Amino acid sequence: MMIVIHNRRMVAHHDQQGAEREITLTSKKHQLWIQLFILILLVLHGVACYQDIFTPEGLVFGFAQALSLMAWVCITLFWIEGWFFTLHGMLPLILGLAIIFSFLPVVFPGAIISTKAVHSPGFKLHFITANIAYGIMFFAALQAILMTMQDRSLRSKQRKDTSSWMGILVLGSGSRLLEQLPPLLIMERVMFNVIGMGFCLLTVAVFSGVFFSQILFGRPLIIDHKTIFALLSWAMFGGLLHAHWRVGLRGAEASKWVLGSFSVLLLAYIGSRFVLEVILHRL
């Protein structure tokens, strides 16, 4: 009798292991298809961005082109991170924003801001570096938003919090999205790794802009709102990294710093161009 029970347990254990392996293989195939789909979108979006911005007539840029390029960088980073972490919970949010941003240049075509810059390899490198930094920080900001929602979700489940829009969201359909995200500690680690990489590129972009502004404006340095906001954002991100490494700043406070720093970075160019192009109708 004991032998029969033991054999049944062994069979059940092997069946369970086989089912788990089958689920794992199915999940990996599903992830590969998602990665392939994202790669195709990246190629199409990237070609469109390059053709829209680097034209034979000159460098065409505006807030719509900036958002579209920022979304492309964000999706690229998501695609790279997707090989190492399961970030499917971020996919609907990131793809939704990327689709919206990719069509903005059709409505807001921008304007030629320089006929010389398009022929300068050095300025192209500065331009690409700056926009990659924008996209990386955008990715970090989205992670900060989702981390805030994750944290609020954990608290809301304990006390059934419906006193705020965030509490209502995470108790509703948004909780399904959050369940697909990695644990908070992994999300936080990825976020700070991303910010570290973005800060290095932002440093190069901010200080190389001093030299390449000569191409656009004929002066090595222009002190205007864009310069001030860019330097302020750079200092805020640097302060955030310093506080994280030295005093262990993390969690909700770190997420607030990320969102605040990125908001200032947006004001440096995209915000000002939006006001000029959409509100004031000036190119």
Task: Give the location of each predicted region.
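A generic, lipid-embedded transmembrane alpha helix
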Residues: 35-51, 104-106
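Interfacial loop-to-transmembrane junctions
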Residues: 243-263
